[in-house]
């Protein structure tokens, strides 16, 4: 779990202003989990980055698990930002879990020719 966390921090810990791209929203959606709902293992490839905004998380809600190693148990108001190619899943939940998911793609910055 430590290696995934460290790699994700290195991957995301950059100053976007210094890079030659901007982030654009590729797509976004809401998901409303009730008792016994789950999400199978998946990634958000080809999106470059993904995020989950947790709107409602009951204490009995299932965590999100990345690459079978890193378990994140967010609370309402938490935002999780991660590489889009990182596999993750949500086990069967015992409580409500309402989220907004957003995928981002890198868009090259275009400089005007003067």
Describe the role of every protein-language-model region:
Residues 14-92, 96-99, 105-110:
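Catalytic core of non-heme Fe(II) oxygenases with the double-stranded beta-helix
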């Amino acid at each position: 779990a430590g290696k995934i966390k460290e790699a994700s921090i290195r991957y995301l810990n950059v100053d976007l202003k210094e890079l030659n791209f901007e982030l654009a929203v590729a797509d976004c959606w809401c998901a409303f989990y009730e008792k016994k709902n789950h999400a199978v293992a998946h990634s958000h490839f080809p999106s470059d980055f993904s995020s989950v905004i947790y709107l409602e998380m009951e204490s009995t809600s299932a965590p999100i698990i990345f690459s079978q190693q890193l378990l994140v148990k967010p609370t309402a108001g938490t935002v999780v930002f991660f590489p889009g190619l990182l596999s993750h899943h949500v086990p069967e939940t015992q409580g409500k879990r309402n989220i907004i998911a957003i995928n981002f793609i890198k868009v090259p910055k275009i400089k005007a020719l003067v």
